[in-house]
């Protein structure tokens, strides 16, 4: 879809400027059944956060890397985004909080992602460890 192409192009340019490896494996890309604003919630927010997290890596021992994989298995679309990180994860009331210095316009991204995915009867899981942040989303195609 044009919206996804635009998001990926912008992310690629930001990664190139910040010397971040951006690895893309797209095996399925028909998102025409998803509304334009929801495409941005589903893709732009986690990729923007990934670029920010990688840009904040100062360790020479950790590669700055973002991996995006989109697959279809039977009637399920799987979206997997992983990035390296060394920034802190701020949790408040069981929710991940924005750590961006300007709080205006920030802090709604993960909520909007969850809302968009759930609107299409999908699921989202977020996991992280010391050096990896991982967002996994599934959307059933039967919702079309």
What are these regions (language model features)?
Residues 118-129:
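Glycine-rich ATP-binding loops of the HATPase_c
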Residues 1-18:
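Short beta-to-alpha transition helix within the HATPase_c
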Residues 75-107:
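Glycine-rich/acidic phosphate-handling loop/turn and adjacent ATP-lid/helix
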Residues 108, 112-116:
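A short alpha-helix in the C-terminal ATP-binding CA
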Residues 22-43:
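Conserved short strand/loop->alpha-helix "switch" segment adjacent to the catalytic nucleotide/phosphoryl-transfer site
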Residues 60-75:
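Short beta-strand/loop element within the Bergerat-fold HATPase_c
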Residues 36-61, 115, 119:
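Conserved ATP-binding N-box helix of the HATPase_c
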Residues 87, 129-136:
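Glycine-rich nucleotide-binding loop
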């Amino acid at each position: 879809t044009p919206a996804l192409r635009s998001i990926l192009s912008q992310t690629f340019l930001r990664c190139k400027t910040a010397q971040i490896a951006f690895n893309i494996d797209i095996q399925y890309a028909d998102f025409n059944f998803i509304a334009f604003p929801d495409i941005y919630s589903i893709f732009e927010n986690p990729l923007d956060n990934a670029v920010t997290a990688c840009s904040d890596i100062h360790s020479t021992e950790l590669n700055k890397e973002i991996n995006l994989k989109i697959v279809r298995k039977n009637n399920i679309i799987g979206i997997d985004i992983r990035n390296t990180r060394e920034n802190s994860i701020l949790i408040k009331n069981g929710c991940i909080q924005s750590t961006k210095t300007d709080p205006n316009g920030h802090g709604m991204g993960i909520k909007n992602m969850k809302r968009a995915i759930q609107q299409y009867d999908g699921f989202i899981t977020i996991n992280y460890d010391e050096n990896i942040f991982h967002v996994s989303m599934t959307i059933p195609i039967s919702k079309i």
